[in-house]
Design a protein with these regions (language model features):
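A basic, amphipathic helix-loop patch mediating RNA/tRNA/ribosome contacts
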Residues: 1-48, 87
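Conserved class I S-adenosyl-L-methionine
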Residues: 83-94
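Residues at the N-terminus of the alpha-helix immediately C-terminal to the conserved SAM/SAH-binding loop
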Residues: 94, 98-99, 116
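Conserved S-adenosyl-L-methionine
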Residues: 101-109
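S-adenosyl-L-methionine
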Residues: 108-164
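A short glycine-rich, Lys/Arg-flanked "PGG" loop and its adjoining helix->strand segment in the class I
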Residues: 163-180
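Short, glycine-/aromatic-enriched active-site segment of Class I SAM-dependent methyltransferases
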Residues: 185-201
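Core SAM-dependent methyltransferase catalytic element
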Residues: 231-247
Length: 247
């Protein structure tokens, strides 16, 4: 059995960082994974034979910003998926990685909705363009809390199927509207879920994506494309963006 040592020390021994201080900074930013799972703290003890990865530094308040920025770059030649000048709805906003990217890409306003409290990064709370709606499940959000109906929606939720999240989102959106939502197969797979919640089977990934695409289409939205997220989720699961619009 492999020995276990502190992750910050192991990162330096592997040559991934020059110092433990650098390693600790990267861990705090959520940029280090061990066996495909994001490392939570520098003192965490890891097997010496673990597969370690350190993502490049990013300028966002969370890894979510990396995901959405890459997705928007993928669709950079499709004006439907350009948030510039649009009223956006960020479902599952959390720290605000998606919201931050939307603002950077020119969004006029962002309604950041999350079931938690106090998660939105302080730098975003100060932005006049952001309306933070905390402690609110999107399924029971009163439309009156939105001064304008959104025409650009992004979704990053966990522990719930998109089949439960999207119908209320569709009801809130104006027409035309545009959607980028993260499909997380581990929350769509049901009994097909992989070991310890990690879904590795590409066939299960494909089935989950196909099911969500069919669901979105059945609600009158046109699916443009499904593309893999540029990075995995924090638990090591593969994720996929579904892009769709309603006109």
């Amino acid at each position: 059995m492999a020995c276990r040592i502190r992750i910050d020390r192991l990162l330096v021994e592997r040559g991934l960082f020059e110092s433990r201080a650098q390693a600790q900074t990267a861990i705090a930013a959520g940029r280090v994974t061990a066996d495909e799972v994001v490392v939570a703290k520098p003192s965490q003890e890891i097997a010496t034979d673990a597969v370690l990865r350190a993502e490049p530094a990013h300028p966002y308040v969370s890894r979510g910003g990396v995901k959405l920025a890459a997705a928007l770059d993928h669709f950079r030649f499709d004006p439907r998926f350009d948030p510039c000048g649009r009223v956006c709805l960020d479902v599952g906003a959390s720290t605000g990685g998606f919201s931050e990217v939307l603002l950077a890409r020119g969004a006029r306003r962002v309604y950041a909705v999350d079931v938690g409290r106090g998660q939105l990064h302080p730098s975003l709370r100060e932005r006049a363009e952001i309306v933070s709606i905390e402690a609110t499940d999107i399924r029971v959000l009163d439309p009156a809390r939105l001064a304008e109906r959104p025409d650009f929606i992004v979704v990053d939720t966990s522990f719930i199927s998109l089949k439960l999240v999207l119908p209320p989102v569709f009801a809130l959106a104006r027409t035309p509207a545009h959607l980028l939502a993260l499909i997380k197969p581990q929350f769509e797979a049901g009994r097909r879920r992989g070991k310890k919640g990690i879904v590795r089977d590409p066939l299960v990934h494909a089935a989950a994506c196909d099911e969500i695409a069919a669901f979105v289409s059945s609600h009158g939205w046109r699916v443009a494309e499904i593309v893999p997220s540029s990075i995995t989720g924090g638990d090591g699961n593969r994720e996929f963006f579904i892009a769709a619009d309603r006109s």
